[in-house]
Amino acid sequence: MDLESIPGVGEKTARALTALDEPERALRRGDVATIATAPGISQGRAARIARGAIRLEHDDPGGFLATDRAREVYRNVLALLKSRTVTDYAAQRLETIYPSPRRSRIEDVQAFARDALEREYDETVLTALEGVEPLEKPGDIRVRERCLATADAERYSEARDAIPELSVEIVEDTQGLAELARGYSTVVALDESFAGVTIDGDVQVRPDALETPAEIVPERPLSFFARNRSRLQAAIDVHRAGDLEAACDLEALEDGLSRLDEDGTVAGDDELDRLTTAIDDLETAAGTAESVANDHLREAIREEDVTIEGSDLLSLVERGAGVDSLLSRELADEYAAAVETAREHLIDALDLDQGEAEIARRAFSDEPTFPVERDGDVVSRLREELTAAKERRAGRLKRELAADLADQREGARQLVRDALELDVELAIARFGREFECTMPEFVDGDSHSASAASSERSASDEQVGFAIDGGRSPLLDEPLEAIDPVDYEVTGVALLSGVNSGGKTSTLDLVASVVVLAHMGLPVPAERVRLQRFDDLHYHAKTQGTLDAGAFESTVREFADLAQGGEGSLVLVDELESITEPGASAKIIAGILEALSENGATGVFVSHLADEIREMADYDVTVDGIEAMGLVDGQLEVNRSPVKDHLARSTPELIVEKLADEAREPATNGGSVPDVTGPDFYDRLLEKFD
């Protein structure tokens, strides 16, 4: 696939898309989440790019929604679908599903939709979906406690490119390596020449390090899981709640995630926790140990009776000796006990092991002094030892965890993709169930154009434009149970007549919604739908008021263009007569109907001038009617399903008929009716409607 041939994709965007692992696969699948990981591409832009790629794949010329009202209907039904999603991804993904005239595209989505309608779900699944989001790329990693070392300049450049997470140092000899070991917890020597050297510290000779970067920097693979920890856990929860087949071992992945914090550090290891706590508490524990020793020594001094003869006191003064000498001579045991108390407190407070305890004991000298003070150098040495031990432990645990999770990465990606796609499926399933939808039946043949006929289809199917049984418009702002189901079938071009507020516009909305959803490949709100595959949908809403000359000219020109190329089109028009005076409107509409009929288009024109239009047309125009059964308590009783080949009575005719019936019954006026308002007057009016 030539990326720049996708509508809306230029050189810069194409370059960004090539950064994806499999851009063509993502584009063909409409994988918005993957496309949105390309540099500089948002989810909204990804949806538009995916839609363009799908059009290219199916040789779809676009333009199915040929008018503003047709596009508005699409936006409205799309909004109904999107309102039933949980994730932002699913809402964007639904925008890649659009009405198309291409059979291959429709059938692709139909297969997806049929599977979706079979999905079972409950609130547990929907709740779990709330935590699922597309995976994010981890940020740049910088590991400061490790470094790479080499004596070769070329190797140095290779190392910087292969493992940018670590510093790379040039060393000339073993002494240089030893100096690095004093500044880093771990030094990885890249040169075979360093094999066998003995150096204090953690020095590893790994000539293969650049070929196995994950072993040297386990933070690299772990950063992916750390950054997406909550997203992955949510995807696991979705799979369990929905009883989905998983692309990876859920138990193993969950166990790995439980051992990893969101900052990329290893979690749940007691020894690592001990070392971390010891480092954090070292300064406080050393200070407390000092206080413990001094408190012990002060108490001992208070309780001890010290007797010094004059000659001894004179000798101490002459030697310049102070209290330290006095402690050494008179309170040696008490001082030793105080120091031992400090040492034990430091060791116990930090939970030090034997080797660490040996260093800690040296923090308090055996040489008597008051007050007792810790040796700062020894405390620093202990900190270095603890830090090095922690880094060694963390490094080993990270390598082990990275190895455990290494085989889970692609499966984890698929796990999230499947969870997000489930949200798309459930949105379709919820829409289908809430509006009692069914999958439509297309009656055209194998051609790619909806206007092409097939010799294999039945005679009844060959003629149908659309046939809707038990349809309920999803655009009505009413509960589904409050909407009367509508049956309507049209072949060719028909006029639709009916009383005011009888549901003519709602019928057009129903037809438009059904046709749009069907060409999207989605279920439609009806008991059964058969229709041909159309090339485009022209839906013209009712014009508010008479148009001025310029607007009138533009409207007529638009219909002239449509009439010239109407084959394969579905044309829905609501009261076109409102554009000008009734007489002229009837003539114009008759001419448009003639042209559309000659060109094989399918159309429904709502009009109150059906009788006049039929008289002016040069062919037998089909007139259907939404019939009112009568007036009850001032309200129309209407059969919402259009009656075929029937000119419906108008609202004025129904009112006059009602008045005539009432006039024939004097009791309705409490007595005899004057001649001027008698039944004869209303009967004469009724004759005018014949």
Model-derived regions, located:
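Alpha-helical coupling/stalk and coiled-coil linker elements that connect catalytic or binding modules
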Residues: 2-5, 18-22, 33, 57, ...
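Short, charged amphipathic alpha-helical surface segments
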Residues: 35-41, 53
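A basic, often C-terminal nucleic-acid-binding module that engages the phosphate backbone, implemented
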Residues: 49
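ATPase nucleotide-binding head domains, primarily ABC-like/P-loop NTPase cores
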Residues: 450-690
